[in-house]
């Protein structure tokens, strides 16, 4: 069984494990010292001394077999499992006593490096290590040649993938918790020097107390509104994730998925997709696919077929307290979340932000350092990019001389590109990075930057944080999911309470952008999204063929951004749901909050300007123009 395999595996040096510690010391470290992940050399030395003393005492009351058995029940074996029994259930869905020799060796192979030799994520590396385990057992006489050959021929990795699919469909945590645990693990690695395996062990078995930033009421509201079909005006389709393992006549396995299905049918019809009007239609399509690919004598492996349905279009929302950077709520998808660590569309994918990026990639820089004001004018007329590609407004209309304020209100492409060209694309690129957009590539430093035409796009969370910077008077706060993490003794090991703000924009610039985006709500593309009891500022965004729809905005309390679209980038005929979700969420979370106003900084100056030139109006000339060519602006 597993004890025999593991004993052989660690046989070098008798009872010595990697790192020079005995098995007894390793057991003491795992049980008494939470895995021994101290951050300072002094603490490590102290722990080593205590380990050695306790190991001597333990060996007086337990024999080697008992110590080894206890050790095997505490070691990290990947996939957040501690001990061979947990690993056996996780990888093979059965007790350790039921494992075959082949399965024993696969688990034994994990011990040296649980991440590298994970049989789910790195099956080839595990197979190579497993072969060494079996060869060592053969050389030492624990198994014979026939047993060795039989174990090597066992294709157990398909079985592992089947069990993994079943496990993933039976456990679920919220999108917020997924993002929270990701942040804790990353910070343990980056700040404390842990390996990823050590960080996961600390997270799940180290007795940590994590103080999250989540507001449970806001989280519930976000989940309800993202999943409220009324917000989508009955535009509901279903896609699916599909896994099929077929046992062929010769005993080999063949794996299929929704991707192989898509490839199969698109070879016949390039426009074929896997979006259907009901789950029943999904099932019918799958049955048709199976009838075409399965041959006589093929059978579906036990537990070898899983289907997960996904509502389309999808949506995500992030809500941040701009004053602190605290993420108070986050939803990464629409529909039932059937497993932990599923695709989080708020944090783990990038999509094009569309016109929401006009503020981030152009106007923040233009007003802050480009020498322009909301009254600055460009001629909204047919033109082209520098490479000769024609440039159009979304409605193919042109309005002549137009101020920046009006360009923001009406989301005008031509005027925005002309303004970015005037200040230099490099300045817009620099400000976008300073506003927290980490996904930019050097190639994004071009005229399409201001329209959201990016190499990779942005995450919903980072877009929210960039708008939160404007809402916070120009000061950027890194978005965080926890305030503090404490160890089992109550000591603070990770601390976000000192989440230091960084000034990115002058407070006057932030206020000007806010003022213009308030007009977006009252008279522009964001009409209908205003709140009944709170001032709001926001910007809309859609991309080519409406593949993405985005709505980002804020109040004096909170900033939120909603993304919506099909997972496979299908064109959309209805895009208003991003604005509807944003409005519904923000209206509900502000219902009982005292009204606050956006505070105007002392440096703001107003003046009468000419709407055609953007220059100061000339008394006796502009005010005498019967067309009304003068307005008061900032």
Place the predicted regions along the sequence by residue.
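Short, well-structured active-site flanking segments
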Residues: 1, 82-84, 144-149, 357, ...
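Conserved catalytic neighborhood of penicillin-recognizing serine enzymes
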Residues: 11-35, 164-169, 371-428, 488-519
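Active-site SXXK
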Residues: 137, 222, 324-325, 351-378, ...
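Mid-domain, small-residue-enriched loop/turn segments at the edges of structured enzyme/sensor domains
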Residues: 389-393, 424-465
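A penicillin-recognizing enzyme superfamily signal
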Residues: 212-232, 238, 242, 246, ...
